[in-house]
């Protein structure tokens, strides 16, 4: 049996900040239970999927795997990041102590069908799609964005991650985790303008500077994965 451990409690800045205990506890329990059960039942291989938020807030960009645990985390999603780092370390520990073929991959920001569009808990891309769609439908004159719009983010279609996950199951057996990204970045404001144009919204974009920006830049270094022979194919 092969286990793809993609289950997690996830959300944007608002949810991460508001439910800090839940984000830490729920994610620790999910990964600990599944990883331990996989060991007990003797699964052939397990892939644990983490997140790019594991990296320190001021880590050099693009983010390389060796930057893990070299500095302080972004405060807004620290509980989630700590849980994901624990998942990586669990896989490494079970490999070291029991010889389990448990591997870890850290995907960048994902988007795609069946995303979470709840404004209280969604990530930035689905949140913006919903905001612009509803503003157009209701004739609202402006869409308010959190922060300045200057942070840079990388996005990957979920189908690309599925493809990369299968590739890693077949070709990757190392103890250390590996980045999975698209290699392309865009500012949040540019993303908003793109969505505004696609939706056909004619109103204005305004900024709520009282709300946090999050990490200034988050781009993955995909060198290791590219060298193995995989790269993303779906552009934003």
Language-model-detected regions and their locations in the chain:
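NAD(P)H-binding glycine-rich loop region in Rossmannoid oxidoreductase-like domains
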Residues: 1-27, 40
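Conserved Rossmann-fold NAD(P)-dependent oxidoreductase catalytic core, especially the SDR/UDP-sugar
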Residues: 5, 32-77, 103
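Conserved catalytic-core motifs of eukaryotic protein kinase domains, centered on the activation segment
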Residues: 13-21, 57-62, 114-117
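Conserved catalytic Lys-bearing alpha helix of Rossmann-like short-chain dehydrogenase/reductases
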Residues: 28-34, 43, 83-91, 125
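Conserved beta-loop-beta element that borders a ligand/cofactor-binding pocket
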Residues: 50-51, 88-116, 126-129, 137-144
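Active-site helix of classical SDR
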Residues: 69, 79, 83-86
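Glycine-rich "substrate-gating" loop/helix at the edge of Rossmann-like oxidoreductase active sites
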Residues: 76-80, 108-123, 147-159, 182-184
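C-terminal substrate-binding subdomain of Rossmann-fold SDR/epimerase-dehydratase oxidoreductases
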Residues: 134-236
């Amino acid at each position: 049996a092969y286990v793809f451990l993609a289950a997690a409690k996830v959300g944007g800045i608002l949810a991460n900040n508001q439910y800090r205990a839940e984000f830490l506890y729920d994610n620790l329990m999910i990964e600990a239970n599944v990883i331990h059960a996989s060991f007990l039942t003797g699964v052939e291989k397990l892939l644990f999927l983490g997140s790019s938020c594991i990296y320190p807030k001021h880590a050099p960009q693009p983010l390389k795997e060796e930057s893990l645990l070299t500095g302080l985390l972004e405060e807004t999603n620290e509980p989630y990041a700590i849980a994901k780092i624990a998942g990586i370390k669990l896989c490494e520990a079970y490999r070291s102590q029991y010889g389990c073929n448990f591997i870890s991959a850290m995907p960048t920001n994902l988007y795609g069908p069946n995303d979470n569009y709840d404004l209280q808990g969604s990530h930035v891309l689905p949140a913006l799609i919903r905001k612009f769609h509803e503003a157009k439908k209701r004739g609202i004159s402006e869409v308010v964005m959190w922060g300045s719009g200057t942070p840079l983010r990388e996005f990957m279609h979920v189908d690309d991650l599925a493809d990369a996950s299968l590739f890693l199951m077949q070709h990757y057996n190392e103890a250390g985790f590996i980045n999975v990204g698209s290699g392309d970045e865009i500012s949040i404001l540019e993303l908003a303008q793109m969505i505004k144009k696609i939706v056909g919204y004619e109103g204005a974009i305004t900024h709520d500077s009282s709300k946090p920006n999050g990490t200034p830049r988050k781009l993955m270094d995909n060198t290791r994965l590219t060298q193995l022979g995989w790269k993303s194919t779906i552009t934003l």
